[in-house]
Amino acid sequence: MKFFALFIYRPVATILIAVAITLCGVLGFRLLPVAPLPQVDFPVIMISASLPGASPETMASSVATPLERSLGRIAGVNEMTSSSSLGSTRIILEFNFNRDINGAARDVQAAINAAQSLLPSGMPSRPTYRKANPSDAPIMILTLTSDTYSQGELYDFASTQLAQTIAQIDGVGDVDVGGSSLPAVRVGLNPEALFNQGVSLDDVRSAISNANVRKPQGAIEDSSHRWQIQTNDELKTAAEYQPLIIHYNNGAAVRLSDVASVTDSVQDVRNAGMTNAKPAILLMIRKLPEANIIQTVNSIRARLPELQETIPAAIDLQIAQDRSPTIRASLEEVEQTLVISIALVILVVFLFLRSGRATLIPAVAVPVSLIGTFAAMYLCGFSLNNLSLMALTIATGFVVDDAIVVLENISRHLEAGMKPLQASLQGTREVGFTVLSMSVSLVAVFLPLLLMGGLPGRLLREFAVTLSVAIGISLVISLTLTPMMCGWMLKRSKPHSQPRNKGFGRVLVAMQEGYGKSLKWVLNHTRIVGLVLVGTIALNVWMYITIPKTFFPEQDTGVLMGGIQADQSISFQAMRVKLQDFMKIIREDPAVDNVTGFTGGSRVNSGMMFITLKARGERNETAQQVIDRLRGKLAKEPGANLFLMAVQDIRVGGRQSNASYQYTLLSDDLAALREWEPKIRKALAAMPELADVNSDQQDNGAEMNLTYDRETMSRLGIDVAAANSLLNNAFGQRQISTIYQPMNQYKVVMEVDPRYTQDISALDKMYVINNDGKSIPLSYFASWQPANAPLSVNHQGLSAASTISFNLPTGSSLSEASDAINRTMTQLGVPSTVRGSFAGTAQVFQDTMNSQVILILAAIATVYIVLGILYESYVHPLTILSTLPSAGVGALLALELFDAPFSLIALIGIMLLIGIVKKNAIMMVDFALDAQRNGNMSPQDAIFQACILRFRPIMMTTLAALFGALPLVISSGDGSELRQPLGITIVGGLAMSQLLTLYTTPVVYLFFDRLRVRFSRKNRTTVTE
């Protein structure tokens, strides 16, 4: 009593405490960063290595494997995957959450250094690493276009100037430049001219390499001067290489221009990039795992004017894609939803109390509690994101509950004629323990979430802590500021002016009277209610087992990502046409605002596209509906497939794939993997629960298999090294020399001119100079025939791997897709040598599924323990928890009605319902226990009186929570697909719980009371005997 009086009789101090809480919250709000979701990125490091011209199998065995063995010793690695393709290897290391990315990077560099001696000597550079996840969608894409500069020159500006500067911006993890390659001098050899002049390809390579040398020449000095020696030992342009003498034939000089075309071009001509219908260079910017996307994008945008000034005016630098506008729009929608929730909650209070002064009290308590939470969020290092703001939106209904319970009880005393200050003190004392029990038990629900590990734990931690802090502040405000305001603002009511005798008050009285009559009947037919309660428990179990489930709601971020997969034998020229055709189809869709794409590099049969949709208000379709519409049109394009997926804020794993979810096949027997993967993929593609089924196993590429006749080679004076060198010089885009410039280094690339390699007959024109200086045709000692060969070789750990990717068709859930995959694997009878497991997001979903039931049971157990401690009883907590089954049925039924799968967001709703619906029972049980102990009432009279007197606050608190969540259900703007499952779960659970628990709680209370009496009699009988 003295504690409450301290605040009631000292209004100035109480007001100033509330003002201090508010000011701290305002300051915290201004300092909080903005993000789409809490920081849940796994630390990922990508290692890249290249050996131009090397086959995928060579890259896998000679480059990937040594690196993997060394990298595999690093502590804290969750997963290591690699992909080796023509001339390049990429290894992805995903670390656990506890690894610091910088410390992991140092370990990676040490592992690369340790493996260096095992790598091929012909690698043009050491392996490099980047602290970014290549499977993440870029946070921003910049494009460079020009009518004046070539693609190679644009690429040079992009990689040399722009990418270097952008990479230094805080938060940027990787800047990937695509669409072309660095400028280079290309030497296109004429095999017939070489044969006529008696010049070998090695002669040309040696001559060029020796003619372009950058070596120190020293200095000359006398007694007073010093001269640095400088020579013209470097050749920098094609024009300087053309007159280069590479051989003498019968005393006549053979110049490079006599046997080759020498042009200023690019290192790799098999690259193409486009933005809309125009050739372009793309800068794809990805953030560091721990970086804030909004802050990073803002920093990049702030540097763009400066970057534009560093490049010529004839180059147009544009932002083709930016992830931040949709994130900001989504957060603005949540903030609007929060405001609407506050308004609806206050309206509910006004309808029940019918007093402006009384309504003002919770109208003050709610914003003070919510604003004060921002200070704690800042101290905890949180951000303003969809989940934390959703927590505050839901908290609106919670924080007003405490104030409502106190306010309603004080109002009841005022209506009975008590003086305001006395009513405040008496009313607060009566419900102080009730409010404490409600708040503490509600916070207890979130303790298992705080202890939950992995990505779900990280994801839900901000939500749980934010909501718990809001509830804690609300508890303080409701026991200090609320009674003080009631004592000084409210007046003693007169009988004729009581709100319950007017308007809505009469409706409430009628409802209360009707409830009283129905409750009397229920208390006389408890067995029926008991059967209903048992039925709801069984229905909960059945509905949870059968309801479709997924990991996270499918978001509409306004960005689509597409992967092109063409025939494995397609040429680059044909692939470029496919890219243009696909882009044309997509550009014609009315929902599309911008499209960029690129193809080429080490995988000539694949490409990537990034599509920006129009703002949500400018299109009628969701991102998934746009994909469904485009899927039919894209399927008509022969010889290639374009797989589209909506970019999500959460993507787990480092695998680059053409779909959202992955299933990985592993085997130590590569032949078995290559045999079974097509069978499994074909079977899965026929399943209606999956869409866009594709695989990264590409082992049907066209290969020309040369077989050397070693005896003939020995007789002709030719060794294998010379023959291999011939092939590399001719067809490997071999980098044979380096041109040093102040800003960058460029290569001299040699190959047979593409005009002479249009078909297999090009091999007939190849000659090797033997030990006697004679030109020997390749066909003299080698035979060849076409064969199939892999375009890529993939590993997971040290095992051969193949990842099957898939999307979900409209109406299908991830649980249904998972069941279909497991069923298919069983039906096919896949041997034990081929192991299958889900990967990435699908794997996290499996882990979450296994822990969901345990998490819910842990929350219930935690609440039981807390309530048992508060009530010093084993029985009363069970009475209070008997409200949960009806809420579960309501939540699951609502999800079914809205055709929404059970996701991690819906799980949050279930956890919240555990905390919300027990409040009704707490108010009933508290009053009934007090009536039994202090009012000498029978258990039945006590619980009946408790139900009647607590009817109004129960209705107020339930409707406040329900209306607080209602805006989440009806929201339709950006990010609504993330909010709706939470609102649907809470509204459905509250509605069903309110309907049933008003009757089941008193019945359960009486059941346990009779059970207690029966055991007490048995114990007394035993003692007497």
UniProtKB/Swiss-Prot annotation:
Record PANTHER family: MULTIDRUG RESISTANCE PROTEIN MDTC (PTHR32063:SF34), PTHR32063
Keywords: Cell inner membrane, Cell membrane, Membrane, Transmembrane, Transmembrane helix, Transport
Pfam families: ACR_tran (PF00873)
Record localization: Cell inner membrane
One example GO MF annotation: xenobiotic transmembrane transporter activity
Name of protein: Multidrug resistance protein MdtC
Family: Belongs to the resistance-nodulation-cell division (RND) (TC 2.A.6) family. MdtC subfamily.
UniProt topology in membrane: Multi-pass membrane protein
InterPro entries: AcrB_DN_DC_subdom, Acrflvin-R, Multidrug-R_MdtC
NCBIfam families named in the record: PRK10614.1 (NF007905), RND_permease_2 (NF033617)
GO cellular component, one term: plasma membrane
Transmembrane segments: 3-23, 333-353, 360-380, 387-407, 431-451, 463-483, 528-548, 853-873, 875-895, 897-917, 953-973, 984-1004
Gene symbol of the encoding locus: mdtC
Statement: the UniProt record of this protein carries the keyword Cell membrane: yes
KW Transmembrane helix (keyword) present: yes
Highest rank taxon of the organism: Bacteria
Quaternary structure note: Part of a tripartite efflux system composed of MdtA, MdtB and MdtC. MdtC forms a heteromultimer with MdtB.
